């Protein structure tokens, strides 16, 4: 099922797979991807970790920044990448 971006991030937070309409933002339940860049992961304790590609010097793209923003809402840990 093709979902809205905020729902993709929510499904990652629930450890479920999901994808948006064109596959540019997706989760396999463990990792969260913006295009082919892994922006989120799940550690051995089940904590959701988001890599902050919006920070100064680590900016990737406008779209990836939006995807990171959605992921932050469901992350336990935010890493400055």
Model-identified regions with their sequence ranges:
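Terminal leader/tail segments of proteins
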Residues: 1-81
């Amino acid at each position: 099922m093709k979902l809205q971006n905020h729902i993709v991030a929510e499904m990652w937070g629930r450890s479920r797979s999901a994808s948006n309409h064109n596959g540019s933002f997706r989760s396999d339940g463990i990792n969260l991807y913006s295009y082919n860049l892994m922006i989120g992961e799940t550690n051995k304790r089940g904590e959701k970790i988001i890599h902050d590609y919006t920070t100064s010097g680590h900016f990737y793209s406008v779209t990836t920044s939006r995807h990171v923003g959605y992921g932050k809402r469901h992350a336990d840990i935010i890493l400055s990448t």
